[in-house]
Amino acid sequence: MQAQSYVKVINFVRLTLKGNYMASILGIGNALTDILALLPDDSFLKEFHLPKGSMQHVDMETGDKIWKTLKPMGVQLVAGGSAANTITGTAIFGMESAFIGKVGDDDLGHLFKSDQAQYGIRSILLKGVNSSGRAMVFITAPNAERTFAVYLGAALELVPEDLDPEWFKGYDYFHIEGYLVQNQATIRRAVELAKAAGCIISLDM
């Protein structure tokens, strides 16, 4: 997932180099923590009714149960989400980078912020009512087949009224996550604010 984002980022950064000046970018998207779990067999998947090799969205109850069960298993955690991955890439390449999203007041929300902080990203993370969103990836032996369970959680709570015009000022580019299409009112408001701030707008598909 991240490899594809970084290919896009390399091409994007090439376009934003202006002499000795590196452009700045603000992104908005679903703030999700990627959780990678290696499973010896598919018994875990069967327990949570996840067909092997599938990608499913799950509700809060199921998402929280899966995460509680995964915690002791030594899983790998990293801040993810399409736009967040792009912003991480631009930060790594030296662009001043910031990200707008919504998380829960929980361990995964704190991890998301600290993970972005290590790359120097300015995290504008609002607190939601629900628990933090997560993309859980299960890699099952013996053929390393991947199964996905996605819980969007607090990320879905981002609304137009959350957006502050001051956040958009001073950035050259504004990047929107394509997966936010389900939240059209928020996208429209974000585009209005970005245009008012003079940003060039990009959208991943």
Language-model features: locations:
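Active-site-adjacent beta-strand anchor residues
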Residues: 80, 98-102, 126-127, 177
